Amino acid sequence: METIHWQWTLILVSSLILFFLSPLAKTRDQFFKAVSNRKAPNTLVLTGSLIISWIFAKSITNAANLGLDYGIVGGVAYAGYYLSFAVAGILIYQMRTKGRFKSIHEFLTTKFGKGAMAIFSILIAIRLFNEVWSNTMVIGSYFGESGSQPYYLAIIVFTVLTLAYAVKGGLSSSIFTDVIQMVLFSVLLMIILGTIFSTEDFSTTDIVTSGTWSFELGLNLFFAAIIQSFSYPFHDPVLTDRAFITSPKVTRRSFLLASILGAICIILFSVIGVYAQTQGMKGQAAVEVGKAFGVIILLVINFIMITSAASTLDSTFSSFSKLLAVDLKMGKDLTFGRISMAIIAILGTLPVFLDVEILSATTISGTMVIGLTPVFVFWNMKVPRISFYLSVICGLVFGVVLVFGVFPESLMFTEGKYADLLWVNVWGILSCIIIYIIPKFIVIKR
């Protein structure tokens, strides 16, 4: 059997297995809150769900490519984004225990009004929209060249099959399959790393000496990731939805564990790129390493991409349906929730037919929402409602500045790739905090 046939078999068989294993949601609590027999997910289940739902196909592709470009420094830099879990876990714990808020939307509506909640909802809807195409494009790339018939066919089939089991159980299906996918991911990653370390010309010494710890060669991205971690998690409903389905203590514990374990997973996956670097490979690190080791490892890498992309997709579908049905109260029954899943699946697939860079779904959207930093970091600070709008608009402006590459070089104090990303975020987040707090003192003076 040819490799391409094995790849199709992996997609079809794994999706069908998940469909038949997924629980059928019959109540709103099961579909939108993953409550089964009045029991919420425990620490182990929630931690696994958090990690795998954030180990996107695009994120592990980026991790491997950064390992290829910058050595282990690139992997560590990208793992910086996983500080997001710790930040969200601690702040949402405080919001739930001290503020008694039951959702992010309730917090925003109570403190800043319905207008702020509407703007926030638009931001996270765009985020969910991005998640669909940016992950399915990675899957398509394993089946054919971008724009080819096999490429499009793989994307459409994969999206439909994932939608099928997501529609069946909603968030219950998502979290249930997350556990299976996390176990699969761990086993497959160990197989890949075991194969790499079994070669005679690669060792841990090669990993340690593979990069240079300088701003120009990876640290720009690392510090940008750390800065964005104080706003990034709050515009990701896949993450925040899971912060309100268990007790505050279980949630905090799970998020802190996910922060550490998720970062380790990303760094380990970047080792694939480090190996590619030592062998002088070019192009997509994961694909090239798979080809170098033969059909079996290529299929293992392909399967790990399918696993991570499916996890992200089903989480995206369930979060979008919850956004419309629960947070925005646009529909009450499960039928509405299932229809909304189909809508985001269709809309999110349309950009596949356009030429869009995968990485842009992470870095640019991350910059555009830095205005959320003071909103959540200073969640208990009394400020007028205008503070929310000023900070969010300020963040969007800096995001646009980054997109068009018009940020003054005189305000960048490091060089190399991602220098603009770092310094736009540094100056942007300082501006957002200042502009968020200023109205507080103006109102007091009056």
Describe each PLM feature range.
Residues 1-23, 388-446:
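A generic transmembrane alpha-helix motif of multi-pass inner-membrane proteins
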Residues 35-100, 227, 239, 244-280, ...:
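Membrane-interface helix-loop-helix modules in multi-pass membrane proteins
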Residues 101-109, 169-178, 234-264, 281-287, ...:
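Hydrophobic, small-residue-rich membrane helices and short re-entrant helix-turn-helix hairpins
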Residues 114-118, 322-360, 365-366:
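Loop-to-transmembrane helix boundary motifs in multi-pass membrane proteins
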